[in-house]
Protein backbone atom coordinates (compact mmCIF):
# COMPACT_ATOMS: atom_id res chain seq x y z
CA UNK A 1 0.00 0.00 0.00
CA UNK A 2 1.37 3.44 -0.90
CA UNK A 3 0.08 6.72 0.42
CA UNK A 4 1.18 10.35 0.32
CA UNK A 5 1.93 12.78 3.12
CA UNK A 6 2.67 16.50 2.96
CA UNK A 7 5.82 17.81 4.65
CA UNK A 8 4.76 20.67 6.95
CA UNK A 9 8.03 22.59 6.67
CA UNK A 10 8.35 22.87 2.89
CA UNK A 11 4.84 21.86 1.80
CA UNK A 12 6.24 19.12 -0.47
CA UNK A 13 4.59 15.76 -0.84
CA UNK A 14 6.46 12.56 -0.22
CA UNK A 15 5.33 8.99 -0.52
CA UNK A 16 5.36 6.35 2.14
CA UNK A 17 5.12 2.72 1.24
CA UNK A 18 3.70 0.46 3.88
CA UNK A 19 4.65 -3.18 3.48
CA UNK A 20 2.05 -5.85 3.82
CA UNK A 21 2.75 -8.07 6.77
CA UNK A 22 3.68 -11.66 6.16
CA UNK A 23 1.02 -14.17 7.09
CA UNK A 24 2.14 -16.80 9.58
CA UNK A 25 0.34 -20.04 8.82
CA UNK A 26 -0.52 -22.47 11.61
CA UNK A 27 1.34 -25.80 11.65
CA UNK A 28 -0.21 -28.50 9.46
CA UNK A 29 -1.23 -31.63 11.35
CA UNK A 30 -2.21 -34.66 9.29
CA UNK A 31 -4.50 -37.56 10.17
CA UNK A 32 -1.62 -39.95 10.89
CA UNK A 33 0.07 -37.40 13.21
CA UNK A 34 2.61 -36.07 10.70
CA UNK A 35 3.29 -32.36 11.28
CA UNK A 36 5.06 -29.65 9.30
CA UNK A 37 5.20 -25.89 8.98
CA UNK A 38 4.26 -24.57 5.52
CA UNK A 39 5.08 -20.89 4.96
CA UNK A 40 5.40 -18.41 2.08
CA UNK A 41 6.20 -14.73 1.78
CA UNK A 42 8.72 -11.99 1.20
CA UNK A 43 11.55 -13.28 3.40
CA UNK A 44 10.94 -16.97 2.82
CA UNK A 45 11.97 -19.53 0.21
CA UNK A 46 8.78 -19.29 -1.84
CA UNK A 47 7.77 -18.36 -5.38
CA UNK A 48 6.91 -15.56 -5.57
CA UNK A 49 8.83 -14.04 -2.67
CA UNK A 50 6.03 -11.62 -1.82
CA UNK A 51 3.44 -11.31 0.91
CA UNK A 52 -0.29 -11.65 0.33
CA UNK A 53 -0.32 -13.03 -3.20
CA UNK A 54 -3.23 -14.80 -4.84
CA UNK A 55 -1.34 -18.05 -5.45
CA UNK A 56 2.12 -19.39 -4.64
CA UNK A 57 3.91 -21.82 -6.95
CA UNK A 58 6.44 -23.00 -4.35
CA UNK A 59 6.58 -22.70 -0.57
CA UNK A 60 8.89 -23.32 2.35
CA UNK A 61 8.39 -26.35 4.59
CA UNK A 62 10.00 -26.40 8.00
CA UNK A 63 10.76 -29.01 10.61
CA UNK A 64 8.56 -31.96 9.65
CA UNK A 65 7.86 -34.39 12.48
CA UNK A 66 9.44 -37.28 10.57
CA UNK A 67 11.58 -37.95 7.50
CA UNK A 68 9.47 -37.50 4.35
CA UNK A 69 10.90 -38.89 1.09
CA UNK A 70 8.73 -36.67 -1.14
CA UNK A 71 10.54 -33.51 0.01
CA UNK A 72 14.09 -34.72 0.78
CA UNK A 73 15.58 -33.22 -2.38
CA UNK A 74 14.53 -29.73 -1.18
CA UNK A 75 16.20 -30.03 2.26
CA UNK A 76 18.77 -27.40 3.19
CA UNK A 77 20.23 -29.79 5.78
CA UNK A 78 19.56 -33.32 4.46
CA UNK A 79 21.54 -35.00 7.27
CA UNK A 80 18.84 -34.13 9.83
CA UNK A 81 15.52 -34.17 7.94
CA UNK A 82 13.38 -33.20 10.95
CA UNK A 83 15.53 -30.21 11.94
CA UNK A 84 15.82 -28.31 8.67
CA UNK A 85 14.00 -26.11 6.19
CA UNK A 86 12.89 -27.31 2.76
CA UNK A 87 13.18 -24.47 0.25
CA UNK A 88 11.06 -23.80 -2.84
CA UNK A 89 8.91 -26.93 -2.57
CA UNK A 90 6.34 -26.94 -5.43
CA UNK A 91 2.81 -26.64 -4.07
CA UNK A 92 1.70 -29.87 -5.76
CA UNK A 93 4.36 -31.75 -3.77
CA UNK A 94 3.00 -30.26 -0.53
CA UNK A 95 -0.47 -31.46 -1.51
CA UNK A 96 0.94 -34.96 -2.16
CA UNK A 97 2.61 -34.99 1.27
CA UNK A 98 -0.69 -34.04 2.93
CA UNK A 99 -2.53 -36.74 0.97
CA UNK A 100 0.12 -39.37 1.80
CA UNK A 101 -0.43 -38.72 5.50
CA UNK A 102 -4.21 -39.06 5.38
CA UNK A 103 -5.23 -35.46 4.82
CA UNK A 104 -5.11 -32.35 6.98
CA UNK A 105 -6.76 -32.42 10.40
CA UNK A 106 -5.77 -28.87 11.34
CA UNK A 107 -3.51 -26.02 10.33
CA UNK A 108 -3.22 -23.60 7.44
CA UNK A 109 -1.41 -23.51 4.11
CA UNK A 110 -0.55 -20.61 1.79
CA UNK A 111 -2.74 -19.97 -1.27
CA UNK A 112 -1.88 -22.38 -4.07
CA UNK A 113 -1.58 -25.45 -1.86
CA UNK A 114 -4.69 -27.58 -2.22
CA UNK A 115 -6.18 -28.40 1.17
CA UNK A 116 -7.14 -32.05 1.48
CA UNK A 117 -9.16 -32.50 4.67
CA UNK A 118 -8.86 -35.81 6.52
Residue ranges and their predicted role:
Residues 3-22:
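Short, Lys/Arg-enriched N-terminal segments with co-localized hydrophobic residues
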Residues 14-15, 25, 56, 63, ...:
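Sequence-level detector for tyrosine residue identity
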Residues 28, 38, 61-63, 94, ...:
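Generic structural hydrophobic/aromatic packing signal, biased to beta-strands
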Amino acid sequence: MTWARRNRQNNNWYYIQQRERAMIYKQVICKDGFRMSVQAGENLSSIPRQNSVERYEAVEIGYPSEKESLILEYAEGPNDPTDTVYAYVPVHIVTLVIAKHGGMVSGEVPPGVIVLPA
